[in-house]
């Protein structure tokens, strides 16, 4: 698949369709860690986007406009903020590109919390229901994750079997397999620090911008 639109909308993609001529349109909504301070600032000049973001903010009863434009990294790392912010961002940016984009899409999918945006896009439930759901989901997960200091780290490269063995030996959990050559390790902050001190050979480690290890046994 190749990205279309702008690089700031990484969840819009198109590529050759198998079995027939022409392109297919896939909309893939991202999960936590995709948010950055000010990442929605440039979009606010688009009235379609700003109106939709304000509406979704009101539904969720969270100031997503501020969080998407001026809030700092620590604030938007909070799961209770990040999850509704990313769902609203996915919906509002897509509508800004094309108000009818979801009805034209051949494929709708989401990574982690992005599945809620994809569900709303597919019509499985309304955008309002999506925002209420993700607000409650984010709050519940934030509360559960706060009981122990945990986090996640992306492990890129290395031998797959060696990486998984090293993750297990460190007492960590392989929370996500994000594609060939990338596994996300989840666990306590202390476990991840020890893992980073002695990483598997030929790997690069990238701590994720998340409030905790939001998966499996850690919440």
Q: For each predicted feature, which ranges?
A:
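Gly/Ala-rich beta-loop-alpha elbow adjacent to hydrolase catalytic centers
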Residues: 110, 114
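Alpha/beta catalytic cores of group-transfer enzymes, especially the acyltransferase/condensing modules
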Residues: 32-34, 60-62, 72, 121-217
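Short amphipathic alpha-helical motifs in flexible or low-confidence regions
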Residues: 6, 217-219
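A broad detector of short, well-ordered amphipathic alpha-helices
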Residues: 54-55, 88-92, 115, 128, ...
């Amino acid at each position: 698949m190749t990205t279309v639109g702008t690089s700031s909308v990484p969840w819009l993609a198109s590529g050759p369709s198998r079995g027939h001529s022409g392109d297919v349109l896939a909309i893939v909504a991202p999960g936590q860690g995709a948010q950055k301070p000010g990442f929605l600032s440039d979009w606010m000049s688009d009235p379609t986007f700003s109106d939709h973001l304000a509406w979704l903010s009101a539904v969720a009863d969270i100031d997503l406009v501020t969080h998407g434009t001026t809030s700092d990294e620590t604030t938007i790392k909070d799961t209770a903020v990040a999850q509704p912010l990313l769902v609203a961002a996915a919906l509002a940016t897509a509508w800004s590109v094309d108000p009818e984009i979801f009805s034209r899409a051949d494929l709708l999918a989401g990574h982690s919390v992005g599945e809620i945006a994809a569900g709303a896009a597919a019509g499985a439930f309304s955008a309002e229901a999506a925002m209420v759901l993700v607000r409650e989901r984010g709050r519940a997960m934030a509360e559960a994750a706060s009981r122990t200091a945990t986090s996640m780290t992306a492990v890129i490269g290395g031998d797959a079997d060696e990486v998984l063995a090293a993750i297990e030996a460190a007492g960590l959990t392989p929370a996500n397999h994000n594609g060939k050559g990338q596994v996300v390790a989840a666990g306590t902050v202390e476990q991840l620090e020890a893992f980073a001190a002695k990483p598997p050979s030929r790997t690069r480690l990238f701590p994720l911008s998340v409030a905790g290890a939001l998966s499996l046994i850690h919440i």
